[in-house]
């Protein structure tokens, strides 16, 4: 999202978990488009609630109007703004690991995997921004004994390295 927003240039708002926060931004006319990882999407002027069907219809419309497949359109977009790789993993935690991790997530970190942390965002627990195109976010689930780890990087090898570092961060004492 940020890569695309930077290209246009428009602001990006990161909210806590819950589409209600995105709906509020739409109602306040702060954003035109809002989405979340579960394919929930809303566009100002439509429903201020998440709607996966709208997202699918808009993709179908883009394919029909442009005469190019989704894959072709993504390739063109990535050529313009640069590709990013991302992943979400759930790591199941034993109670002692969970307690230790919660304390670690509340600290401010200057380095992650020997790389400098340029910025910390606490909108949703701990997001460590490493540079313009790489970051790691860790947050405990509110419903099960897992930590959700999100990583983004410009290449697959860098993403794999971030995932390995995140797993080590979670499980190392």
Describe the residue ranges of each PLM region.
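Phosphate-binding and adjacent anionic-ligand microenvironments
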Residues: 1-173
């Amino acid at each position: 999202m940020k890569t695309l927003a930077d290209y246009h240039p428009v602001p990006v708002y990161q909210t806590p978990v819950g589409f209600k926060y995105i709906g509020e931004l739409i109602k306040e006319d702060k954003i035109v488009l809002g989405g979340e990882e579960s394919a929930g999407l809303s566009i100002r002027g439509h429903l201020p609630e998440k709607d996966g069907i709208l997202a699918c219809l808009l993709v179908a419309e883009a394919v029909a109007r442009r005469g190019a497949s989704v894959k072709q359109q993504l390739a063109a977009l990535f050529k313009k703004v640069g590709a990013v790789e991302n992943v979400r993993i759930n790591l199941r935690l034993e109670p002692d690991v969970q307690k230790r991790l919660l304390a670690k997530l509340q600290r401010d970190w200057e380095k992650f995997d020997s790389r400098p942390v340029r910025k910390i965002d606490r909108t949703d627990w701990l997001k460590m921004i490493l540079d313009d195109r790489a970051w790691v976010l860790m947050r405990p689930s509110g419903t099960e004994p897992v930590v959700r780890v999100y990583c983004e990087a410009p290449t697959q090898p860098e993403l794999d390295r971030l995932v390995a570092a995140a797993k080590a961060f979670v499980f190392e004492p």
